[in-house]
Design a protein with these regions (language model features):
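Surface-exposed, secretory/extracytoplasmic low-complexity segments enriched in Ser/Thr/Asn/Gly/Pro
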Residues: 1-198, 203, 250-252, 257-274
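Active-site scaffold segments
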Residues: 204-258
Length: 274
């Protein structure tokens, strides 16, 4: 009796070729110093064979990418931060960090596996950060101490500038939120519009929705405890020259770290030179 399928059957050969093709694929992901290698031994467990048809189980691909996302995404996570005051703190909140578009990445990864093409992949991201690993914000960032009403700008780990400021009015519930954010964009000569105000500013640097840093030429003093009763609607009000200087250094994506630190309160405020 002649077998239904012989070893030289074209259909069988095609099936074996497909299985071999999947089995030789090696895809490498680099997350800083960490390397994740996906090879044929894993991919072969994602294959479904029905008769001569070989299909890649998309759910298995999605599950794999989801484990990468869980391991390497840093958005919405707490961060350890060494302040300019020599104290290490934990900063919660904010929307800064690596954020993988895992569904899109799973589609593109599956498509690459289907072609049988080995190589290195960079995941598809909704949002990237400065660095893999800790700290993901890197060494260029704006540090905002809401307790001291004082900010610092570091570039490549070096302090470049600092300034007093006035943040959100505590008495009216406009406290500037803590958290790790990034500069959304920067704009010259913007008009800030709220429910009951319309304010033109020369240097606008938003980082948390409608909260940002800007010059406040209507103020003659900054720092101290002004914010407690005469603060802003949430923005970081800066002296004109300091806002101008910071504007020249920062760019879209520059991390902004806001925190409170007990023991750094300052009762005195800085007066602008007349």
């Amino acid at each position: 009796e002649t077998p239904a399928v012989t070893s030289d059957s074209e259909e069988l050969q095609n099936t074996l070729q497909k299985l071999q093709k999947y089995g030789t694929v090696t895809i490498t992901y680099r997350f800083g110093d960490n390397i994740e290698v996906l090879d044929g031994s894993t991919i072969s467990t994602w294959l479904e064979v029905d008769g001569f048809a070989v299909t890649l189980d998309q759910t298995q691909v999605e599950n794999y990418v989801a484990t990468l996302r869980k391991k390497y995404d840093s958005i919405f996570r707490s961060r350890t931060f060494m302040t300019s005051y020599g104290k290490e703190i934990t900063v919660d909140g904010g929307d800064y960090g690596w954020w993988m578009n895992y569904q899109q990445e799973a589609k593109e990864l599956a498509a690459q596996i289907e072609t049988g093409e080995s190589g290195e992949r960079t995941p598809v991201y909704y949002q990237t950060a400065a660095s893999y690993g800790a700290p993901d914000y890197g060494d260029t960032y704006v540090e905002i101490n809401l307790t001291a009403q004082h900010l610092f700008f570091y570039k490549d780990g070096q302090l470049v500038m600092e300034s007093d400021f006035v943040s959100g009015n505590s008495a009216r519930g406009y406290d500037t939120p803590e958290g790790t954010y990034s500069i959304t964009y920067k704009q010259r000569n913007a008009t800030l519009v709220g429910e009951n105000y319309e304010t033109p500013v020369s240097y606008w640097m938003p980082f948390n929705k409608n909260i940002g840093m800007h010059d406040a030429t209507w103020r003659s003093s900054f720092g101290g405890t002004i914010y407690k009763t005469k603060g802003s609607h949430g923005c970081i009000n800066m002296p004109y020259e300091k806002a101008q200087e910071l504007y020249g250094y920062i760019e879209k994506g520059t991390p902004v770290i806001c925190y409170h630190l007990a023991g750094t309160e300052r009762s005195t405020e800085s007066e602008l030179e007349k």
